[in-house]
UniProtKB/Swiss-Prot annotation:
Binds 16S rRNA, required for the assembly of 30S particles. The gene is rps14. Its cofactor is Zn(2+). GO terms for cellular component: cytosolic small ribosomal subunit. The keyword rRNA-binding applies. It comes from Aeropyrum pernix (strain ATCC 700893 / DSM 11879 / JCM 9820 / NBRC 100138 / K1). PROSITE patterns: RIBOSOMAL_S14. This is Small ribosomal subunit protein uS14. Zn(2+) binds at residues 19, 22, 37, 40. Binds 1 zinc ion per subunit.
Amino acid sequence: MAKIRPPKPKRMGRGAQRCQRCGTRDAVIQKYGLYLCRQCFREIAPTLGFRKNR
């Protein structure tokens, strides 16, 4: 039987960055070194000092 190697960790592309809070790989905000997904950013943004521009 053949040996199965574990997959290599991704280093480039959309799947390489993960949200530090929930671990999802969709819509990760990397600006300012945040590495949060869109949903987590909306929950945490007021505590970080971000405001809505309206």
